[in-house]
UniProtKB/Swiss-Prot annotation:
Pfam families: Forkhead (PF00250). The modification Phosphothreonine is found at T608, T624. It comes from Mus musculus (Mouse). Residues 43-54, 110-124, 140-149 have a biased composition (Low complexity). The keyword DNA repair applies. PANTHER family: FORKHEAD BOX PROTEIN M1. This is Forkhead box protein M1. Residues 604-613 have a biased composition (Polar residues). The gene is Foxm1. Transcription factor regulating the expression of cell cycle genes essential for DNA replication and mitosis. Plays a role in the control of cell proliferation. Also plays a role in DNA break repair, participating in the DNA damage checkpoint response. Promotes transcription of PHB2. InterPro entries: FH_FOXM1, Fork_head_dom, FOXM1, TF_fork_head_CS_1, TF_fork_head_CS_2, WH-like_DNA-bd_sf, WH_DNA-bd_sf. Expressed in fetal heart, brain, liver, lung, kidney and limb, but only in adult thymus. Appears to be expressed only in adult organs containing proliferating/cycling cells or in response to growth factors.
Length: 760
């Protein structure tokens, strides 16, 4: 302890009695100076009892919710008009009061109040995030657990600053006397401390030193012999200037190297007693570096002299630069010129001291404890309170989606893949694993073109033996119409979806080839289906890259349709019967072998095997496909039976999403919208049941898809207040609400034009 002079000093300072009487007025005064528009903190913050009881005296709009996954963590939703400093103080007192048994980590998020304009809560949210940034930046190494930030007015004397520090600590919480809590180190300054018996002489020396510096700044004329008489202070001149002083002090304006050393040591005692011997190397370096110093040799060639080149010699002497002046006389021009040309480092140091000491909060220290960086923390609120959080526009949807998908992939075995939407009106489609068959004429003439039918959605339900034989005898070729004829209702999302989702498995579609393939016998189909299902279960466990690189099927299947259109059942019944064995459309490989890759739907977007998507009502199908009793189900994601009703979709968009994550229904009310967890339409981890029936969007309304993308991924910024290690971190929160009573996030109340530029 004795070898380190600072540690006993700091320990002694730490145990000083801290005056609290002026703390409330100081705090409110400084708060008024910092931001006159914000409400002043209550004077009752100065006492610990009020701070402890303020945990139940939060403003009306604050809601505290237990975090569903992290223990001892609570989420605090703060309205935009609340006083953040008093809330942080109350939360700190609450965390200190509960200790390790109760909640000691709080996530602060901003929630907008009731507003008639949709853009106004967004302004509140951005203002709150800016205020949170101000708090984190102002605190520096002293986190928010110690209470409010205490910026100092520039003219505050040291004693007032010490009292304001003490007031901030007393208002925040009870002082922690533990030696492991070193957050208060950043608040210590070298002056303005109370009496200390152990290190009294050291503090007096520091204070005298500061007073000397202030005198030198304010009265340069009275500084005549301070540094010259002082051994411990380095002279404020460069080596080049001191060499000029030494050479010009002689009559012949020349001097040997040894004489230069001697002259500097005589006139500047610092170099003789304090400085390390390396300063002589600096002298030699400057002599050889600058061209103004010329080396001359004596007549006999034994002695070398250093002189100054006549054209560069300004005849500077120490008497010109450093001359004792009378206390009221003006300074000489040489003195002013030298002071301007060679700035005094002592003066600069004093100026910085005078600016930094009053502004103690601006002093930056490297944090001694590790700090938590920004991260995404998924939160699902299992409550029925009407809690409105403003989504942050600062976080792009694509970045958050990629971060969230990587987080899910890292923590679970079931990988959720983002839904991929087919591009329209450009003729560019992802490369299918099996090329689509062609159709030369519509099956039902006069009813229009056949929509794009997925192969696995064609179910064989009831086929008469006569029709079976007739269709086996004459195969029919099916041609998918060109992509230009099928407009997409999400044309506004075309560019960003193509940028974010077509990187993995997208390339121009090659020309489909014609091929012929017949249906096998039922027993052969059942055996092939079982073999293929086992093989596909093994292949699902592999990576997507290996599936993508697998060679496609050599022969393409043809589609067979019955002549009557009476066999149609809803997709929910077909999904319920998907576990029964049934004949299946198969593609023989090398004359009869089972195929390796499952038959994809028409124009698949990825190489991941997928199950059939939802079918449509008879009016939009224009013909009834023969539904088979059961089909291969390769999807790693199980769709809940009866989760969705039939989606009226006459544009064929739902059949083009072939990833395991189905393009779910687009909701009309926020309860249905918020019941769906981001990237998980199939399961609700908190047990909220899915809606029994959900209406789909009307065709040609692209705005209804943007709420489903952005409101499901409502990202907001928050702060994490950890009262155990006194840290305040800024995080991004991924929030979804399963149980909202009101309808604040509906499409009518939210201006979705704020989210469209961020998506692009």
């Amino acid at each position: 302890m004795r070898t380190s002079p600072r540690r006993p000093l700091i320990l002694k300072r730490r145990r000083l009695p801290l005056p609290v009487q002026n703390a409330p007025s100081e705090t409110s005064e400084e708060e008024a100076k910092r931001s006159p528009a914000q409400p002043e903190p209550a004077p009752a913050q100065a006492s610990q009892e009020v701070a402890e009881s303020s945990s139940c005296k939060f403003p009306a709009g604050i809601k505290i919710i237990n975090h569903p996954t992290t223990p001892n963590t609570q989420v605090v939703a703060i309205p935009s008009n609340a006083d953040i400093q008093s809330i942080i103080t109350a939360l700190t007192a609450k965390g200190k009061e509960s200790g390790t048994s109760g909640p000691n980590r709080f996530i602060l998020i901003s929630s907008g109040g009731p507003s008639s304009h949709p853009s106004q809560p967004q302004a509140h949210s951005s203002r709150d995030s800016k205020r949170a940034e101000v708090i984190t930046e102002t605190l520096g190494p002293k986190p928010a657990a110690k209470g409010v930030p205490v910026p100092k007015p520039p003219g505050a004397p040291p004693r007032q600053r010490q009292e304001s520090y003490a007031g901030g600590e007393a208002a925040g919480c009870t002082l922690d006397n533990s030696l492991t809590n070193i957050q208060w180190l950043g608040k210590m300054s070298s002056d303005g401390l109370g009496p200390c018996s152990v290190k009294q002489e050291l503090e007096e020396k520091e204070n005298c030193h500061l007073e000397q510096n202030r005198v030198k700044v304010e009265e340069p004329s009275g500084v005549s012999t301070s540094w010259q008489d002082s051994v411990s202070e380095r002279p404020p001149y460069s080596y080049m200037a001191m060499i000029q002083f030494a050479i010009n002090s002689t009559e012949r304006k020349r001097m040997t190297l040894k004489d230069i050393y001697t002259w500097i040591e005589d006139h500047f005692p610092y170099f003789k007693h304090i400085a390390k011997p390396g300063w002589k190397n600096s002298i030699r370096h400057n002599l050889s570096l600058h061209d103004m110093f010329v080396r001359e040799t004596s007549a006999n060639g034994k002695v070398s002299f250093w002189t100054i080149h006549p054209s560069a010699n300004r005849h500077l002497t120490l008497d010109q630069v450093f001359k004792p002046l009378e206390p009221g006389s003006p300074q000489s021009p040489e003195h002013l010129e030298s002071q301007q040309k060679r700035p005094n480092p002592e003066l600069h140091r004093n100026v910085t001291i005078k600016t930094e000491i009053p502004l103690g909060a601006r002093r930056k220290m490297k944090p001694l404890l590790p700090r938590v960086s920004s991260y995404l923390e998924p939160i699902q609120f299992p409550v029925n309170q009407s809690l409105v959080l403003q989504p942050s526009v600062k976080v792009p949807f694509r970045l958050a989606a990629s971060l969230m998908s990587s987080e899910l992939a890292r923590h679970s075995k079931r990988v959720r893949i983002a839904p991929k939407v087919l591009l329209s009106s450009e003729g560019i489609a992802p490369l299918p694993a099996t090329e689509p068959p062609k159709e030369e004429k519509p099956l039902l003439g006069g009813e229009g073109l056949l929509p794009l039918l997925p192969i696995q959605s064609i179910k064989e339900e009831e086929m008469q033996p006569e029709e079976d034989i007739a269709h086996l005898e004459r195969p029919i070729k099916v041609e998918s119409p060109p992509l230009e004829e099928w407009p997409s209702p999400c044309a506004s999302l075309k560019e960003e979806l193509s940028n974010s989702w077509e990187d993995s498995s997208c390339s121009p579609t090659p020309k489909p080839k014609k091929s012929y393939c017949g249906l096998k016998s039922p027993t052969r189909c059942v055996s092939e289906m079982l073999v293929t299902k086992r093989r596909e279960k093994r292949e699902v466990s592999r990576s997507r890259r290996k599936q993508h690189l697998q060679p496609p099927c050599l022969d393409e299947p043809d589609l067979f349709f019955p002549e009557d259109s009476s066999t149609f059942r809803p997709a929910v019944e077909l999904l319920a019967e998907s576990s029964e064995p049934a004949p299946h459309l198969s593609c023989p490989q090398e004359e009869g072998g089972p195929f390796k890759t499952p038959i994809k739907e028409t124009l698949p977007v990825s190489s991941t095997p997928s199950k059939s998507v939802l079918s449509r009502d008879p009016e939009s199908w224009r013909l009834t496909p023969p539904a088979k009793v059961g089909g291969l189900d390769f999807s790693p994601v199980r769709t809940p039976q009866g989760a969705f009703g039939l989606l009226p979709d006459s544009l064929g968009l739902m059949e083009l999403n072939t990833t395991p994550l189905k393009s779910g229904p687009l909701f009309d009310s926020p309860r249905e919208l918020l019941n769906s967890e981001p990237f998980d339409l199939a399961s609700d981890p908190f047990g909220s049941p899915p809606p029994p029936h959900v209406e789909g969007p009307k065709p040609g309304s692209p705005e209804l898809q943007i709420p489903s993308l952005s409101a499901n991924r409502s990202l907001t910024e928050g702060l994490v207040l950890d009262t155990m290690n006194d840290s305040l971190s800024k995080i991004l929160l991924d929030i979804s609400f399963p149980g909202l009573e009101e309808d604040p996030l509906g499409p009518d109340n939210i201006n979705w034009s704020q989210f469209i530029p961020e998506l692009r």
